[in-house]
Amino acid sequence: GVDVEPFGRDHATKGGSYDTGKRIAREVYDIDAPVPVPYDFINRTGDTKKMSASKGTGVNAHDVVDMLPPEVVRYFMLRYSPAKRLYFDETDSLVRLVDDFAAMKQHPQNELDERLLFLCTDGLSHPAVSSIPFSHLVISYQAALCDTVKTVEILRRSSEYARIVDEEEAVIVKELGYVSRWLEKWAPESLKFRLA
């Protein structure tokens, strides 16, 4: 059976769908209802209303997982209490989000960080966030004319990142795919450049 049931806070209102389901579980199936975990909504930064794909104010899940590594999506969702409203910004703040995750991955500050890191990476066979800051990859990738092979070579020649490239080349290549898609679809013009 199901032990825990997360759902949007609108389903947690008195007399809402959770209360109805709880009665059905008890009176029809003679089972205990799952433990409820209501969560708040995700808004786009600057919006006061929850995202809604039907109203054109949302970001669809497919786009999010195409632009962000799965461990970062989990980090975004799990780093705060489910009761806290989250604000998603696919532009500038996305770079900071990936960099924050990478920093926590490299140097967890406490047991809570270690637990969060486990939850973000559990079951992922191929990590997609390297030890090189995403912000640096965004710049390096564009400086290398958006060529993954050239970007890796530039990073390898850097005294700061050579060892990381040797240890994490496959992860870096995978992460550069996210960089490329983000630059193409969501990056603000202020972060884009082209060398002539």
Predicted regions and their residues:
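Extended, charged low-complexity segments
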Residues: 190-192
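Catalytic adenosine-cofactor/nucleotide-binding cores of aminoacyl-tRNA synthetases and other
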Residues: 13, 18, 25, 40-186
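Divalent-metal (Mg2+/Mn2+/Ca2+)-assisted nucleotide/phosphate chemistry catalytic cores
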Residues: 1-22, 28-29
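Glycine-rich phosphate/pyrophosphate-binding loops
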Residues: 31-43
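Short, well-ordered coil loops that connect the C-terminus of an alpha-helix to the N-terminus
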Residues: 30-31, 70
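C-terminal accessory/binding modules appended to enzymatic or scaffolding proteins
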Residues: 195-196
